[in-house]
Regions:
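A donor-sugar binding/catalytic signature common to diverse glycosyltransferases
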Residues: 127, 131, 154, 325-372
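Catalytic donor nucleotide-activated moiety binding site of glycosyltransferases and closely related
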Residues: 280-324
Length: 437
């Protein structure tokens, strides 16, 4: 099966991909990896390795475009251009580019990915997580249009499990024909990793991803100056609008903001990557005497995503009150009518506390009792339908039968890993799931 792999290039997992190819389970045509991992991968596979930035700035033969994406296919992608724009914007490599170049980058990647799929007769694309980053999302969207299978690993934050799906819209449904692997993984040995990014990266490694030292200096000078401006603007508007104290005597919905830019909204949020749109829809369905308590995410540090008009728009949504940051999240969960989120863990925390959750995006826990997926016409009565949160553990245990005991994303988990067992688990999983296709 002619295959593209996106990720799975970390030292502890890459051998599983190589064995899948060597054993004829997949025919590895291209492998999208981090630049720093090139030298760690077997020399025999160097000709299939791709780093996404090379697609847009390399004149090497491997990156030549043989076929331009046809107009009718490009038109189907146009509704996603705002999302692609957002995913480019988050990359520091593209600091200070023009609006015209956003379109140039998008079309370069569309043409490359389309050409790659057609030339190599791709039948399957494996993603190590929900596709994010502009090249990955474009490749996923093209695969759907061209009827190429997509296998997506998905980390279930909160229960430390890796699930899979064939389509992002299946996230949270998890309907499979039969259990694939019975997990013997001990949850006590798996913990959340607080910070997956090393603080010891040297300046040289940071410069390597830019065209030259001057490019790095210029972009970082621009970025630092603009960050200073946006930070001061952020402080001003948060002091102006996030001023309300918590009043538990009134009925309210708790709607915590998401960190942006992140995959949880950019990819999994669908059109609700615009998270204020979700709050506007929420405002329409709740009773007139209810309010929406909005609280900023404490980890929001990219101030460009909280511009002046973000705050102006948020403050003008009927029934919204923006809370001071010192308000206890536990108290909000305890006293709210329900929690509203796009894909956040706040919804999972809510149902475990016996409170309903309304979700707007593709979230892994949407199959659990107490969770409602937003649709036009949903009612508060439907969202607040009674549920037994004791059933949550039963549902989670059922889900474990369909989850992968192997680890694919070390950035989110730390684990006393038996690499040989991990390879076997990944291999067994892929052999079983691909043999059913």
């Amino acid at each position: 099966m002619n295959t593209i792999v996106d990720g799975l290039n970390e030292i502890f997992i890459q051998d599983a991909v190589i064995k899948l190819h060597n054993n004829g389970i997949i025919n590895l045509k291209k492998w999208f990896v981090y630049k720093d991992n090139f030298s760690q991968i077997d020399a025999k596979f160097q000709n299939v390795l791709v780093h996404w930035r090379d697609i847009i700035c390399s004149d090497m033969p491997d990156y030549k475009i043989r076929y331009i994406c046809p107009e009718k296919i490009r038109k189907q992608l146009e509704s996603n251009f705002d999302n692609y724009h957002e995913q480019i914007y988050r990359e520091s490599y593209f600091t200070n580019i023009s609006d015209v170049d956003f379109i140039n980058i998008i079309d370069l990647l569309i043409n490359y990915c389309y050409s790659l799929i057609i030339v190599e007769k791709i039948e399957l694309i494996i993603f190590h997580e929900a596709p994010h980053g502009v090249y990955s999302k474009i490749m996923y969207d093209l695969a759907k249009i061209l009827n190429v299978k997509t296998l997506v690993f998905f980390t279930c934050f909160g229960i430390n499990r890796t699930a899979y799906c064939w389509d992002l819209s299946d996230i949270g449904i998890w309907k499979y024909n039969k259990p694939l692997i019975n997990s013997n993984c001990n949850l006590n040995n798996i913990d959340k990793h607080e910070n997956s990014v090393s603080n010891s990266k040297c300046v040289y490694n940071k410069i390597k991803k830019y065209e030259n030292t001057y490019d790095w200096l210029f972009k970082h000078i621009v970025k630092n100056v603009s960050n200073f401006y946006y930070k001061k603007q952020d402080e001003y508007y948060k002091n102006k609008y996030f001023k309300y104290e918590f009043d538990d005597s009134i009925n309210f919905v708790y709607a915590p903001l998401h960190v942006q830019p992140e995959m949880t909204t950019a990819t999994l949020g669908g059109k609700y990557y615009d998270q204020l749109l979700a709050i506007e829809r929420l405002s329409e369905i709740i009773p007139e005497n209810w309010i929406i308590y909005v609280k900023e995410h404490p980890a929001q540090k990219d101030y460009r995503w909280r511009g002046k008009y973000f705050f102006e728009r948020l403050s003008r949504i009927p029934k919204v009150k923006c809370l001071k940051n010192n308000i206890s999240t536990k108290e909000l969960l305890k006293k709210c009518q329900f929690v509203s989120t796009i894909t956040g863990t706040a919804g999972f925390e809510a149902i475990n506390a016996g409170k309903p959750a309304l979700v707007f995006g593709h979230v892994w826990y949407s199959f659990l009792p107490g969770v409602s997926k937003y649709y036009d016409g949903i009612s508060v009565e439907e969202i607040q339908k009674p549920f037994d949160n004791k059933l949550i553990d039963i549902k989670l245990q059922e889900m474990e039968k369909y989850c992968l005991p192997g680890i694919v994303l070390p950035g989110f988990l730390k684990y006393n890993l038996n690499e040989e067992k991990n390879h076997k688990d990944i291999m067994k999983f892929l052999m079983l799931v691909l043999s059913n296709q």
